[in-house]
Amino acid sequence: MLTRFSQAQQRPHSVAILDAQGAHTYESLWNKSSQIAHQLLGGSSDLEQARIAFMVSPGLNYVATLWGIWKAGGIAVPLCLSYPLPSLAYVIEDTQAAALVIDPEYLVLLQGYAQDNRIPLHLVEDLQVG
């Protein structure tokens, strides 16, 4: 992973990810992941290995979320996009996730659960400034 972080800084204009929206550079990935990390930290200096569960579709936002959690000092817990709520709840509870980061399309599935269990829920797009 350190190699990828190093590439992001040494070759910012190289393509890091190709997805349905097109080509994304390491610079774009680095900036988005930094914004996500900053928002997740919420004024703290480190997440201190808090587990952050995330349900984000493959593409730039998935990798930016993963990197953002790592940059903030958290442990990323990817959630399977096809799991039903009871299976997701099991993973979230078993890992003791401190927060959830999701794509808007999963809001209906997880919003009530997050509220009932007092787990902070973040839309990935709200964690990014630009």
Predicted regions and their residues:
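Active-site charged/polar residues at nucleotide-handling catalytic sites that mediate phosphoryl
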Residues: 47, 94-95, 117
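Conserved AMP-binding/adenylate-forming
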Residues: 22, 37-83
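ANL superfamily adenylate-forming
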Residues: 105-130
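AMP-dependent adenylate-forming
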Residues: 3-25
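Residue-level detector of anion-binding/catalytic polar loops
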Residues: 75, 98, 120
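Conserved ATP-dependent adenylate/AMP-binding module captured primarily in the ANL superfamily
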Residues: 83-113
